[in-house]
Amino acid sequence: MDKAEHDLTDAQWSALKDAWAGCAYCGARQTDLQKDCMLPISRGGRYTLENVVPACPSCNASKCNFEVTSWLRRKKLDEQRFLVRQVEIRRTVAASIAAIQ
């Protein structure tokens, strides 16, 4: 297996956590949020702005190697709401990081 490229910067990760203001999946407001790849590394995902969301340890462990939409359906979470919010936040973070640079 080729080594995956990971290009999520510390500034992007910090901005993602601030924008989500908690777990992207369940909304838990914790300080120990973890980087979760919506498309898992095991399935070709990478640690990038487009693929990472903050997750509480419980959601991160539950999602494990599932692709995000199948996991959201299994957990009976609002898939459309999550995906729309993820795109909005990703665009906002990308624009704010670009403005700084």
Can you name each region flagged by the protein language model?
Residues 1-22, 82-98:
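Short, charged surface segments at domain edges that flank catalytic/cofactor-binding sites
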Residues 22-57, 63-75:
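Histidine-centered nuclease catalytic patch
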Residues 50, 61-101:
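A detector for short metal-coordination/catalytic motifs
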